[in-house]
């Protein structure tokens, strides 16, 4: 069975959680509903996926290469509500307290970092699960890359899952052709213009018939209806630019390694303190369950004379299995055990 990495679209999931969960504040008046919803989605995904690696990508305020290509890119988006904006740095702090690596790169969007990380994982034989509410990411779906799209209503989260065939079933085009659709129909949320007069239905029919905008343009005289033919003839340059804007970069300068992203213990004392400060009482129970399930630290017994050593060796010689470790640290030492409850340490001091 392949290893797996979970890659989360930070702003997208925060945004979904903010609008899906009623307003919450902590005792200090800080809004917390987006952070609370994000963590619930995170834990739900991790419980289901049993992944070995995790990373979260966030957008930065700086313009990206797409803004340089088209100044009006995302120009129609409304400003983020202040109640959500104040939760973004808190979310990053909580994730950092959990030891989760954050992916951010000036000049690139979170989508580009997620796409690059997912493709690198696929090439390394690691399955990737991308969690986002952004349908642009469907272009990345393969048999090794799954897109999971949470929807939270009244505090209840449901998740749609997409591998390559699921995209085809839902949209009648392949994942890579999602880009072609955007090139023709545009994307109002990102202010990608597309071709004026071509909507989703016509775009789907054209891509189903011709595969790409380039091939559609090569056969433009065959296109029906006439309105779509004239629109593509007159605005093909706009279609080409829109395609570039819609294409996720798979070669972003990302330095994340699998070791950086390896999942260890999210339930750290620092993360517990954040959840306590944010009044996330239900989530605190997760920390307590993890602590309760941890094995007790073994008792360490120092063996300091021959009599104790003889008793130890007499006990261990009858065991089917023992573990030992030989190490140098201020002298020569050997640790021996036949259980998880007790470890015996024998040092050269007193014997040599």
Regions found by a protein language model. Give the residues of each.
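Short alpha-helical segments and helix-capping/turn motifs at coil-helix boundaries
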Residues: 38-44, 115-117, 230, 309-310, ...
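Non-catalytic nucleic-acid-binding/docking modules located in mid-to-C-terminal regions
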Residues: 2, 50-55, 100, 123, ...
